[in-house]
Amino acid sequence: MMKLALFSIIVILFSLIGSIHGADVPGNYPLDSSGNKYPCTVLGDNQSCIDVCKKHGVKYGYCYSFKCWCEFLEDKNVSI
């Protein structure tokens, strides 16, 4: 019985690790006309980052590490 409980706990832990790692969404930092990343001050949902990402052709972005990050932004659309 103890082995079954231990096995169950291990399976659950590996499942959680897999779901956390699998949540990564591809994207990129957009660049302005000078080749600089767009700065932001409010981390997380940020309307200015969403606006920047829309200029680069994607629907959503947010402030990450004080720079705008755009989800699903491809390399070819990074620079304006």
Swiss-Prot record:
Q: Which cysteines are joined by disulfide bonds?
A: C40-C63, C49-C68, C53-C70
Which key words are in the record?
Answer: Disulfide bond, Ion channel impairing toxin, Neurotoxin, Secreted, Signal, Toxin
Q: Does the keyword Signal apply?
A: yes
**Compartment(s):** Secreted
Which tissues does the record link to its expression?
Answer: Expressed by the venom gland.
Q: Which InterPro entries match?
A: LCN-type_CS_alpha_beta_dom, Scorpion_toxin-like_sf, Scorpion_toxinL/defensin
Task: Look up the signal peptide feature and give its range.
Answer: 1-22
> What range(s) does the LCN-type CS-alpha/beta domain occupy?
25-80
The entry's free-text remark on domains says: Has the structural arrangement of an alpha-helix connected to antiparallel beta-sheets by disulfide bonds (CS-alpha/beta).
By sequence similarity, the record places it as follows:
Belongs to the long (3 C-C) scorpion toxin superfamily. Sodium/Potassium channel inhibitor family.
Know the name of this protein? Toxin Acra I-2
Originating species: Androctonus crassicauda (Arabian fat-tailed scorpion)
Provide the taxonomic classification.
Answer: Eukaryota, Metazoa, Ecdysozoa, Arthropoda, Chelicerata
